[in-house]
Amino acid sequence: MKILFAASEIYPLIKTGGLADVAGALPVALRKKGHDVKLIMPAYQGILEKVAPIQKSINLGNPFGVGDLLLLETHIPENDTPIWLLQCQALYEREDGPYVDKNGIDFEDNHIRFAALSWATATLALHGHLMNWQADILHLNDWQTGFAAAYLESWKVEHIPVVTTVHNLRYNGSFDMNQFSAMHLSPELLNMHGMEFYGRFSGLKAGLVYANAVTTVSPTYAKEILTPEYGDGLDGALRAMQDRLVGILNGVDYNQWSPEKDTLIPHNYDIDTLSQKQANKLALLQENGLSEDLNQPVFGVVSRLTEQKGLDLVLQVMPALLEKGARLVVLGSGDKYLESQYLELQNNYPNQVSVRIGYFEDYSHRLQAGIDALLIPSRFEPCGLTQLYALKYGTLPIVRQTGGLADTVFEDGERANGFVFKEASAKALQAAMERSIECFHDTNRWQEKQKNAMCYDYSWDAVTDQWISLYESLIN
């Protein structure tokens, strides 16, 4: 099959969250199975320095009046995956991140920036002769590429199957109606059964309603988003299409995330050399100037610092546990108030708490290898990848039972690989953390859970066949 895979971020070129990890790994896994996959993504500032020399370019014109759209053909050196980069200086050459300015405010022209990406994607899918390659299927990801389904609908194209994957329903890419005329889409699409969304228009809703299949990144999340509690205003539309909605769990690239061969951690280890995890723990504590007592647990957070992630709850419970000797290592950024609260916690417990604001890939590996337990108390979690990384590193996740966390972390029975709580409350989180501390001091029980965790296979190889079956069902 020839699969055109569109995303707004792709690891290792650019990453703000789990979408980049998926977009960087699933196409590689599909190519290993013999399928012809090509990626498309904007040429953000600095991206051209990270790819192979440009092999071919084509000018798609200036449909949005902001400058010519150039499609550049190249590949990602790390895995040889072919990629088309959409270049437009006015839209993508910015020093800030891909979506927001340095103050964390959405770019005012995001509707045009990602309409252009979507338009180019749809054009490429429809007119394969432009690059001498005709896609059999188009795979879109989140709202930034969802508009591509609307362009194909607007152009009355029916012969190209479209799959849209929702990585997080909360980011619906909705815009004011007075911006719609700039999109060059048919006004016929602006209705409650189309891309209209509570008096606005939405890129995500376009991607949902005009797709042949909709996927989410875990089976439990696929069920949750049919309810008002988790549906973020789209549950009605999703219930109407639930016959073409499926949850496929995200995978992990174990070439990147495996303690046996991870070049970013001080001491490699596997299930038979778990004592080396203690060496990583000591190295992490020393790196951060924290108390080096190996007989007390170290909890970790690698996350966006937001209420969605439940990280306000961690702030409520942590002081009581720190008083008993626990440590906390945090890596993340997000809500400015939460950032300041975590930094204040660090100031109050300088020998027990380390906080780094931002995201640093190499440090996240050292953190996963060095902590004992990873905190993920999310109010909702479409899939979650950090708990999958943690499991492979023998780091036990402490999670709220929601979305992909419910599909991958279990507290009891033969599958036990972490700690689980149900209610999104500080009390429930603290009880789970106290259970983990009790288990930590029972070395045999703790190591049994660690070994269970490390045996789970959440590799992309294990889930790729589900994607192939879905694609084939749509093409046939």
UniProtKB/Swiss-Prot annotation:
The biological process GO terms on file are:
glycogen biosynthetic process
Check the record and name the CDD domains matching this protein. GT5_Glycogen_synthase_DULL1-like
Question: A Pfam family this protein belongs to?
Answer: Glyco_transf_5
From the record, give the transmembrane residue ranges. Answer: none
Q: Which GO terms describe its molecular function?
A: alpha-1,4-glucan glucosyltransferase (ADP-glucose donor) activity; alpha-1,4-glucan glucosyltransferase (UDP-glucose donor) activity
Q: Where does ADP-alpha-D-glucose bind?
A: 15
Domain of life, per UniProt, equals Bacteria
Q: Which family does it belong to?
A: Belongs to the glycosyltransferase 1 family. Bacterial/plant glycogen synthase subfamily.
The name on file for this protein is: Glycogen synthase
